[in-house]
């Protein structure tokens, strides 16, 4: 899922991706029955995910790109809603900016997400190229080093891994942190 509101829950009229085919090249049409279909879908998905991540990481004043990968959700709708809820949580976005591994804010965002799942089975990891910390096991604190967590959260690209523990569905969403500069940029903006 990618939409421009993953930066601040407001949709911009300027962010659009349009894919068109005129047929003028004379290539055979790609349909679900065509052997090229799976390769086309995989390539298009990779491009769309890359553009979505680039867009989210380029939010006003952003210093971190946040990716949330949800696994073992009961269904795709819930997996998508949970991943989006985490990256859109202003409290969690501010925690990332402050390099605070505040797993309670992640759990809060998951908890207010509509869906039929057991919050008691949720496990959460925070990772980046600096390492990984396991911060929440079965909706409770999992011991971790604050110093290690701060190192993980000092990197630009932050991955939040959420294991719902209830099914086979998965989804991914992207967002960015919430910074002082975001407020300044948008507070100073005049139309």
Task: State where each predicted segment sits.
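Short, small-residue-biased leader/transition segments that mark boundaries at the very start
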Residues: 1-3
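Active-site-adjacent loop/helix surface patches within enzyme catalytic domains
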Residues: 6
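Short gly/pro-enriched beta-turn/loop segments at secondary-structure junctions
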Residues: 12-15, 61-65, 119
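Active-site-proximal loop/short-helix segments
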Residues: 14-22
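Flexible glycine-/small-residue-rich
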Residues: 20-21, 70-72, 126, 162-164
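A glycine- and small/hydrophobic-rich beta-loop-beta segment
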Residues: 22-98
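Internal helix-turn-beta structural module
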Residues: 81, 88-191
